[in-house]
């Protein structure tokens, strides 16, 4: 058995298929963080604890983790993608919520990111005099996509024969996927590749952008071709 999959991506020209053996897409997790302050009128900040200022300090500190705590030879990404707090200009609110996203290629680096988030959030809350402990919930955890080298080499050979110069090595990308959950659970080797979807790929919006609308052609036909070619590498007569 072998597991095959693909995903349209903005970092390749339309019609190009990109493979990569070994670690391909990063593992990831997200964190929902709620911190507490003490609400008060905006004209009397000394009477409260400002959770917006607290959250801002957390954001600043979190963004030093990759540059100051992770080995420069390792890949890591930490992004604060959302911060929510308050409803009025003249009211210091009770709480602030942050949403954090991380990426890494090894469990060790991922664990260091997780530990740093906990340490920094708890430390900043203590420094601010927060009236209660923060809540940190980790979610949306996706494993590393590690393409089997033998499977990938075989599929890449089929792509080279069929697509010629439009088959390339994509290299590692820091996006993440749940694709590997099923083959990992079944103990089945797999490969997952990218498919270009935009003629103007250098200015293409990223995945999950509301403007992400791949060119219908040649993307649709090339996607169908790629799946057929990859499957045929395993199903046609003479395949090992």
Predicted regions and their residues:
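Histidine/acidic-residue-rich, glycine-tolerant segments that coordinate divalent metal ions
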Residues: 1-82, 87-93
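Metal-dependent amide/peptide-bond hydrolase catalytic core
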Residues: 53-240
């Amino acid at each position: 058995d072998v597991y095959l999959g693909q995903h349209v991506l903005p970092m390749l020209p339309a019609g190009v298929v990109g493979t990569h053996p070994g670690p391909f897409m990063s593992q990831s997790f997200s964190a929902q963080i709620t911190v507490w302050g003490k609400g008060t009128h905006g004209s009397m900040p000394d009477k409260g604890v400002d959770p917006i200022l607290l959250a801002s300090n957390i954001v600043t500190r979190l963004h030093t983790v990759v540059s100051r705590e992770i080995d420069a030879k390792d890949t890591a990404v930490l992004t604060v993608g959302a911060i929510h707090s308050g409803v009025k200009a003249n009211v210091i609110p009770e709480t602030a919520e942050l949403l954090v996203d991380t990426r890494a290629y090894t469990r060790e680096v991922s664990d260091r990111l997780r530990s740093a988030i906990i340490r920094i959030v708890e430390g900043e809350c203590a420094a601010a005099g927060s009236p209660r402990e923060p809540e940190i919930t980790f979610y949306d955890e996706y494993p590393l996509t590690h393409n089997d080298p033998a499977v990938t080499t075989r599929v890449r050979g089929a792509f080279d024969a069929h697509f010629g110069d439009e088959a390339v090595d994509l290299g590692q990308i820091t996006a993440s996927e749940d694709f590997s959950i099923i083959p990992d659970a079944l103990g089945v080797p797999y490969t997952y590749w990218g498919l270009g979807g935009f003629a103007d790929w250098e200015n293409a919006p990223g995945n999950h952008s509301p403007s992400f609308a791949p060119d219908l052609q040649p993307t649709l036909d090339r996607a169908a071709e790629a799946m057929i070619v990859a499957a045929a590498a395993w199903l046609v007569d003479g395949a090992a």
